[in-house]
Regions:
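N-terminal Rossmann-like NAD(P)+-binding subdomain of aldehyde/semialdehyde dehydrogenases
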Residues: 1-107
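Conserved small-residue-rich beta-alpha loop and adjacent elements
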Residues: 92-149
Length: 149
């Protein structure tokens, strides 16, 4: 028996004999996130950071300002540009990066699994966001009393 608590952004809290539906869902989500424009993803996280700052800064606590800064479009865009040879669009399409013999296109790994520590709530968000902006789907094992996701 496998217990599924959350799937496709909805609380389920059910047990299942087979996780095939979850596997199919992950594969569908991989296709969906790969089809998203990188600038749209960055804009989403920028808006999410501002929303959390406005609505949940007390719950997030002392790390609220750091989280908002991390989620900013400017910060995440810089991280991508550094990781992707100076051009984040390489995750969208083939790009000529001035190598006469090559053109580049970054591919997501696919599925990233996160085990989130219960003693540092905010750390899990950083790794999940980095997986998502590189167009990877996340499977998250959160501690029992995890409130941020």
């Amino acid at each position: 028996m496998t217990k599924i608590l959350l799937s496709k952004g909805k609380l389920l809290d059910k047990e299942t004999e087979s996780i095939q539906n979850s596997i199919d869902n992950v594969n569908n989500q991989r296709q969906w996130i790969h089809s998203q424009n990188i600038d749209d993803l960055l804009e989403f996280f920028d808006k999410l950071g501002r929303y959390w700052a406005e609505k949940y800064s007390k719950e997030i606590g002392v790390n609220s300002k750091h989280l908002i800064s991390f989620l900013s479009k400017e910060n995440l865009g810089k991280k991508l540009d550094i990781a992707l040879r100076g051009n984040r669009n390489v995750i969208e399409k083939f790009i000529d990066l001035s190598d006469p013999e090559l053109i580049f296109h970054a591919q997501p790994r696919g599925v990233v699994v996160h085990w989130i520590a219960g003693n540092v709530d905010i750390l899990g968000i950083f790794s999940v966001v980095q997986a998502l902006i590189t167009k990877n789907v996340s499977i998250i094992k959160a501690p029992a009393k995890y409130q941020l996701l």
